[in-house]
């Protein structure tokens, strides 16, 4: 089950059996039988301000794993209030761009004693910070997730020119992928859904790395077969379906 509130990403979930809902009671009931869950704050409705914190609490209370995509963290009072509330009942994995991770780290007060933290200006849905600028923030957030995780571990995935995944201690860099991913809508949001699919069957760090590698390989294949953003988006779906485990396993992983 994914509680995904980014309309443009709905059609891009592949290989997982997804149930998507805007209704809090439906989400909470469905979570009981779900392997993992996904909350995306990309498109908000007024009642989400109360509904999403309630859902996070129920997931935590019932020991359910879930993935958060903090889309446009730092923009708007409602989105900020929702994301701040997740500090108490946090997700198992956070997936976002560098600016979103830095903003979430600041919102949760994890960076208050770190004078090296970049400015926490709102960045919208596009990153204005490099992945390297988010390393410390990502590690702090991952350690915070692990404290509350029903499986005793958490992970943060930072998307960028070279993706980064950390469990709070170890840092993995994942070269590759396609710059065309930044030219279409819903790519990051659908990656969150795929991450949740992996989280249903793997520990958080493995799930976050596997999903990111899958998307990197598929996007490379799609770019080679497409002529622009429109054809790339369609070809990416086919590539996600057809990419093999061997192709993903051959990916380069750099350990800091």
Labelled PLM ranges:
Residues 78-171:
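Conserved phosphate/ATP/ADP-binding segment of small-molecule kinases
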Residues 9, 17-19, 35-38, 64-66, ...:
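Structural motif
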Residues 216-256:
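Charged C-terminal helix
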Residues 48-97:
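Glycine/small-residue-rich loop that forms an oxyanion/phosphate-binding "nest" at active or ligand-binding sites
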